[in-house]
Amino acid sequence: MAGFKKKVYTSGLGTAEPYAYLSKPDYGNEERGFGNPRGVYKVDLTLSNKDPRCQAMVDEIVKTHEEAYAAAVEEFEANPPQVQRGKKPLTPYEGDMPFFDNGDGTTTFKFKCYASFQDKKTKETKHINLVVVDSKGKKIQEVPIIGGGSKLKVKYSLVPYKWNTAVGASVKLQLESVMLVELATFGGGGEDEWADEVEDGGYTASESRQSRDEQEWQEDEHEETPDDDEDF
């Protein structure tokens, strides 16, 4: 919808879990039957429950889900879907939330976004480069492999979705951009194909290469940015 503004949130400082894909997308494994041609950027971020932002994130997600689910159920009851005679419509049901309490004083949040989309007019596939900034909020031109154990903050939006035959109604934590505060290149991350082949004393890439037109990464928890209907 023209002029629509989506609300963008900022997470607390957390630790990336293994198998993060932030410098390049995860395309799955087509040969094994779970390929993803659009590609996905993703990271599971674990925060301490003592961080006030952690509970605030949980509250925001739950509130968004409850409001969206209630509206969807009301619409379902007012206008039941038409199905073939003898079949029952799929009734509303809720799915898992995109976070879980680990039982050790931490909570893990699951963020992701597609790495490409199809232009509705030209049908052309357009790729999305996830913005990653350094601890000063400046854009990193060549994003390093970000492994499990890295310290991050993320900007994200909340995208509620309805139930279907595969999953129940829930909320997607749509990844918008990432702040890399402390880099842990190795440690089992999804991109760490050379993690077991380290050679000491050799060439090491610079930790952060910044663009000339450095952009500030604001800390506003409720920053509003234009929504792009064609991203997802």
Curated annotation (Swiss-Prot):
Keyword DNA damage (UniProt): yes
Entry-linked HAMAP family: SSB_T7
Bias type Acidic residues, positions: 190-200, 216-232
Domain notes: The acidic C-terminus is involved in modulating the ssDNA binding properties. It is also required for dimer formation and for interactions with the viral DNA polymerase and the helicase.
Function per UniProt: Single-stranded DNA-binding protein that participates in viral DNA replication, formation of concatemers, recombination and repair of double-stranded breaks. Coats the lagging-strand ssDNA as the replication fork advances and stimulates the activities of viral DNA polymerase and primase/helicase. Coordinates simultaneous synthesis of leading- and lagging-strands. Together with DNA primase/helicase, promotes pairing of two homologous DNA molecules containing complementary single-stranded regions and mediates homologous DNA strand exchange. Also promotes the formation of joint molecules.
Family the UniProt entry places it in: Belongs to the Teseptimavirus single-stranded DNA-binding protein family.
Keyword line: DNA damage, DNA repair, DNA replication, DNA-binding, Viral DNA replication
UniProt cross-references to Pfam families, sorted A to Z: SBB_T7
Any one GO BP annotation for this protein: DNA replication
UniProt lineage: Viruses, Duplodnaviria, Heunggongvirae, Uroviricota, Caudoviricetes
Subunit structure: Homodimer. Interacts (via C-terminus) with the viral DNA polymerase. Interacts with the viral helicase/primase. Part of the replicase complex that includes the DNA polymerase, the primase/helicase and the single-stranded DNA binding protein.
Segments for region (Disordered): 190-232
Dimerization and interaction with the viral DNA polymerase and helicase, as annotated region: 213-232
UniProt protein name: Single-stranded DNA-binding protein
UniProt GO molecular function: single-stranded DNA binding
